[in-house]
UniProtKB/Swiss-Prot annotation:
UniProt-listed Gene3D superfamilies: P-loop containing nucleotide triphosphate hydrolases
Protein name per UniProt: Urease accessory protein UreG
Binding positions for GTP per the UniProt entry: G10, P11, V12, G13, A14, G15, K16, T17
SUPFAM superfamilies per record: P-loop containing nucleoside triphosphate hydrolases
Organism of derivation: Corynebacterium glutamicum (strain ATCC 13032 / DSM 20300 / JCM 1318 / BCRC 11384 / CCUG 27702 / LMG 3730 / NBRC 12168 / NCIMB 10025 / NRRL B-2784 / 534)
Major place of residence: cytoplasm
Database matches in InterPro entries: CobW/HypB/UreG_nucleotide-bd, P-loop_NTPase, UreG
Record's GO cellular component terms: cytoplasm
Compartmental location: Cytoplasm
Superkingdom assignment: Bacteria
Any Gene Ontology biological process: urea catabolic process
One Pfam family hit: cobW
């Protein structure tokens, strides 16, 4: 059984790379991890993760997709598949791999053959009505995150409205609010990973 793979999707600037950086920083002493970033023409996100995060550079792979970002995570996952295979061969102890998509629209989803779980993140600055649009990325993800809550007063967004809209389309699926700049709400994300993804409750039983 190989490492668990978590897809991280969302629009440009929503906080995908920062989310991976914050999670890996918090779990570095608990879990053996690696990360893969996807972008169209650069590996800038991989460089940022290596410079600002705690993962060794050799555990971070940047992929230049050269086309539509969601193709590499859904229709043709071959580049990501190869990156995962390479990481597993180099680090047999891997328990968790994050696959960050390139910035994409609200309909982007991960192939179930590529990842085991997925997170979709948006930010408040994109507008109060974004959750109401209920794109497939927000609906189908295992965890939905509304990030940059601190910006709500400055962009005229009502967080209560966003929460109610999220409840309506998420039904019983989890979602949370975060301000990753200050780690506010990160505890909810970590709790989800520990208990829903890593299933620590079962391991400790």
């Amino acid at each position: 059984m190989g490492p668990i793979r978590i897809g991280v999707g969302g629009p440009v600037g929503a906080g995908k790379t920062q989310l991976v950086e914050r999670i890996t920083r918090a779990l570095i002493d608990e879990v053996s991890m690696a990360a893969i970033t996807n972008d169209i023409y650069t590996i800038e996100d991989a460089k940022i993760l290596a410079a600002n995060g705690v993962l060794p550079e050799e555990r971070i792979v940047g992929i230049e997709t050269g086309g539509c970002p969601h193709t590499a995570i859904r229709e043709d996952t071959s580049m990501n598949d190869a990156a995962i295979k390479d990481l597993v061969e180099r680090f047999p102890d891997l328990e968790l791999i994050f696959v960050e998509s390139g910035g994409d629209n609200l309909s982007a989803t991960f192939s179930p053959e590529l990842v085991d779980f997925s997170i979709y993140i948006i930010d408040v600055a994109q507008g109060e009505k974004i959750p109401r649009k209920a794109g497939q990325g927000m609906i189908k993800s295992d965890l939905f995150i509304i990030n940059k809550t601190d910006l709500a007063p400055y962009v005229g967004a009502n967080l209560d409205v966003m929460v109610e809209d999220a409840k309506a389309f998420r039904k019983n699926k989890p979602f949370c609010l975060t301000n990753l700049r200050t780690d506010d709400g990160l505890d909810k994300v970590l709790e989800w990973i520990r208990h829903e993804v890593m299933m620590q409750d079962l391991q400790e039983a």
